Every structure is written in structure tokens, then in C-alpha cells.
A protein has these predicted regions:
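The ATP-binding site of the protein kinase catalytic domain
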Residues: 1-308
Length: 308
């Protein structure tokens, strides 16, 4: 990068500049999400040859279970008695849960109790359906969830149906099953029917995001795209600059020295000018990450050509 000059001791072909972006200071803070906005740079960068992510501070404020993820509801149908059945969609509050609290929350919704531990609605058949998890407080067990009847109505319950092909209104739709609450519970099939007791196929995983993508659209289609997906259903944006593994507990700040970032410099096929950036965070399904009105910051290292 450095060559001897005739007048100055050293002439350099490339100038490196660091651009700090903190979403707290974006102009459109009241009308845009921190995970999807466009910024007009105060300085125009001319003859840019590369861009690279060099620092990131990301608060872990996004939820594993939420309406925006489409996994905050559970459809159940129970057949009981000689010829009776009941079906209902149950809504789980948005939030982050550990496995045991996740199962407790669902059970409390199925069977609400009063301050004395008595059923509020003993006449409702769902009060006798329970999820359980084979996991102790110190982490021992299989981590798998089961569902079945309990209590005085156990013998009258004939069949339980779990249907993850239905939306929050109880209607069948075509959303991928991997985006439903069934996958968080470890139930990987679209539907479970014909029995009154089921064991999950996989372990419970209420934490929804294992990684996120940082996308930077510089409005130049003149660079390499280092991220390639080998699966048809995996969505990758052409402007992905980094893949960020999520580590640590929720509601903490994730710093670049505490995370695993996969990132390659964006190399342009020829010098470009940059004055506008669209910044987005995607979850692993390719959806805009819902940050719950919190902000993040990062640093871009931009290399530009210098006229000698």
C-alpha cells in the first residue's frame, strides 16, 4: 500500500477511514426501526475499494417467542367423552423464556389457577391437559417435552391434536413449520393427531435466534457476495456483510470480543462512491429483527483510493 514519493517521504495508494454508526442518532428515529433504516452520510466517500465490519455492539433485546416471529400461539383440539370435542388457540405472551419457565407459562395458560392453587375453570377440558419437560434445574434430563391428560378427566380424554399448520386465527396456512411454536417445543412435524399422549421429536428451544445477519446496502451492485446458502428455504440477502452468532443471556449487551462474527471485506470490482446506506438486521429466517425499540452500534472500515 505504500510507495516512495518524490516530494513526501511516503505516498500511499489507499486511505483507510472508520465510520461509526450508532442507531440512536439516526434522523428518522421515531418513524423507523433500528434494524431497518437508511442513512445519508454527511461525508461522501469517493473511489471506495472495500468495506469491512470491524466492531459491533448489539443488545440482546429481541424475543424468542413473539407475535412478530409468528410463534406465540398454540392450537389444540381435544376429543373427550362419547362424542365431544373442543378446540382453541392459546396465546403465549411475547418474551424470552428458559425451558422450564416456557413450559410453566403454557400450562398456566391452559389451566389458570387462583392464589390457593385451585383451578379457575374446572369445567373446561383444557384444564386437564399438561405439558411437561424432562429437565431439572441443574440441566439434567433429556430436554424433551411431553403432552398428555392429567387429573380427574384423564380417562375421559380420547384424543389430543397438535396442529402447527394453523395460524393465530385457527385457519390453515402455508407458513413454514420451522417458524411455528412447535419447533420451539421440539415438535417438528406439521400435525400430531390420533393419540392422547405425545413425546417431542427434539429438545425444547425457546430461544429462537442462534445468529443474525447484518446487511449493508450501499446502493452499488459492484461487489462480491461472500455469503451463499445451500438450502432453498434459507433466505440470504445480497447485501449481507456479516453473520453474528448469538451468545450470552438475553437483555445483555453483546460486544464484538464476546461473539463469533463471520465477515469478509466487501471488495468492489472497481472504485465506487458511497453516500447512502440502508442498514438492516435479519434473523435466521430472513425477517427483519425486532429489537423492541432498542439500538445498536457498529464500525465500518472503508478503504478509498488516493490520487498520487
Amino acid at each position: 500500500d505504500f510507495l516512495p514519493g518524490r516530494i513526501n517521504p511516503i505516498n500511499t495508494r489507499v486511505i483507510t477511514k472508520c465510520v461509526n454508526i450508532d442507531t440512536r442518532f439516526r434522523d428518522s428515529i421515531n418513524t423507523t426501526q433500528s434494524s431497518d433504516f437508511t442513512v445519508q452520510l454527511t461525508t461522501k466517500f469517493s473511489k471506495v475499494v472495500s468495506m469491512e465490519l470491524t466492531a459491533l455492539e448489539l443488545p440482546l433485546t429481541f424475543y424468542g417467542i413473539s407475535a412478530s416471529n409468528g410463534n406465540n400461539f398454540l392450537y389444540l383440539k381435544v376429543e373427550f367423552g362419547e362424542d365431544s370435542h373442543s378446540e382453541q388457540v392459546f396465546i403465549i405472551p411475547d418474551g424470552n423464556y428458559n425451558p422450564n419457565d416456557f413450559i410453566d407459562k403454557i400450562n398456566n395458560i391452559l389451566c389458570p389457577i387462583d392464589e390457593h392453587g385451585k383451578m379457575l375453570y374446572p369445567e373446561v377440558i383444557f384444564s386437564y391437559i399438561r405439558f411437561s419437560i424432562d429437565l431439572t434445574s441443574d440441566g439434567s434430563g433429556s430436554g424433551k417435552v411431553t403432552i398428555g391428560p392429567v387429573g380427574s378427566q384423564t380417562m375421559s380424554i380420547n384424543k389430543i391434536t397438535l396442529d402447527f399448520t394453523r395460524n393465530i386465527h385457527g385457519n390453515t396456512d402455508t407458513v413454514e413449520i420451522s417458524k411455528r411454536i412447535g419447533w420451539n417445543l421440539g415438535f417438528l412435524k406439521p400435525k400430531y393427531e390420533g393419540d392422547f399422549f405425545y413425546v417431542a421429536d427434539s429438545i425444547v428451544e425457546p430461544k429462537n435466534n442462534r445468529y443474525v445477519y447484518l446487511s449493508i446496502d450501499d446502493f452499488n451492485k459492484n461487489s462480491n457476495n461472500p455469503f451463499i446458502s445451500i438450502f432453498n428455504q434459507s433466505i440470504l440477502n445480497d447485501d449481507i456483510l456479516a453473520r453474528i452468532s448469538i451468545k450470552g443471556s438475553h437483555f445483555n449487551m453483546l460486544l464484538d470480543n464476546e461473539m463469533s462474527i463471520v465477515s469478509e471485506p466487501r471488495i468492489y470490482f472497481g472504485p465506487v462512491d458511497i453516500q447512502r446506506l440502508r442498514i438492516r438486521l435479519f434473523d435466521e429466517h430472513g425477517r427483519i429483527l425486532q429489537m423492541n425499540n432498542t439500538n445498536f452500534s457498529f464500525c465500518l472500515t472503508i478503504k478509498t483510493m488516493y490520487d498520487m
